[in-house]
């Protein structure tokens, strides 16, 4: 299943390990390190980064959507998969 992370950008749900807030120092360091390694994907379309998605391939994806918004989308996908809708 795929999750829309904003502006038409999608990520495979099975590859997501975590969705975190970008404000803490460790997350800023993680973002900088990913940039140096060539593992940073900026999907913000020039807007403020509101969440960081960490994948199992060690990629860091920046999104302009709030963590809560992405979580709602993931939960909706899970409900559809479970047949609750």
Curated annotation (Swiss-Prot):
Source species, domain of life: Bacteria
Q: Spell out the Pfam families in the cross-references.
A: RemA-like
What the record says about family reads:
Belongs to the RemA family.
PANTHER family named in the record: REGULATORY PROTEIN SSL2874-RELATED (PTHR38449:SF1), REGULATORY PROTEIN TM_1690-RELATED (PTHR38449)
Tell me what this protein is called: Putative regulatory protein THEYE_A0405
Q: What is the species listed in this Swiss-Prot or TrEMBL entry?
A: Thermodesulfovibrio yellowstonii (strain ATCC 51303 / DSM 11347 / YP87)
